[in-house]
Amino acid sequence: MEDKKTTRLRFNLFDVVIILLALAVVGAAVLLRNRSTGADMTRTTTPVRYTVELACVMKDMANQMRVGEDIYRSTDGAYMGKIVDVRWVPHVGREFLPEAGRFVRYEVPENFDIYVTVEGQGYWNGRDIIVEGVSPKVCGEMFVKGKGFAHAGYVCNIDLMGAQIAQGDRTGSGNLEATYVIRFDDMREMLLGAVHKGDQIYEKLTDALLGTVEDVWTEPYGETRLGADGQAVYADKEDVYYMYVRLKGRMVEKADGYYLDSGTELKVGATVTVTSQYFSRMGTFYALEGMEEAK
């Protein structure tokens, strides 16, 4: 009979072999996973800045925001980056004057629009700009917090600080290539540079490709109100615009209509929420300009 010391030694050696085999399996699995997501694992990060507008707030809130401090997403506590700039301007309201038949601008006492610029390490994943795990989009809502403050705002600018990103190269699967226009209402001037020729636009809810931007143009934005005589008056809003985006994309013709890759029917007058690498907002299908067989 073998003594207990020899038996224990054999068991220990056997355990070591099992552990080494298990580690080898785990290591192989990790290696395969890294290879399958190589584009993500080998990404190069670079400093990216974006500005969040916190509209119509008391100036005391701005005093709580200090350059150099960390800022977080208030919904889940995710780190967003560091504050590199804080500025505020008087909040401007607009009111329609029936007697004059136009909108007038006025400053709201003791209320300000605060612009907080955040810097973090970002990268391009082929679809979105990711900054510290957050994907900022111009017009996209952002819930922020820091020491002594928390508020909801909207991203109004993204600065890649000289970095370059490639255009998307996805194509749709429809048999028709269509040219159509989406209109975005009530766009302030600071937001107009977020969509560029060559950008790929997606439907936000489904991530299906809508098309590639062919052209972007603007017109003054206005609203219809009742004048002093009770008649309808159309009046422009100063520094506010309609933004029109012409897209070329694939779709499928069915017996009851034209359908995009997402399954959404393209109907002039229907709304759609879109997203791109810089931008996210709800718009309206404005025009279907033409279509031809896809090549």
Which role fits each region the language model picked out?
Residues 2-295:
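Beta-strand/loop-dominated core regions that host nucleotide or nucleotide-derived cofactor-binding catalytic loops
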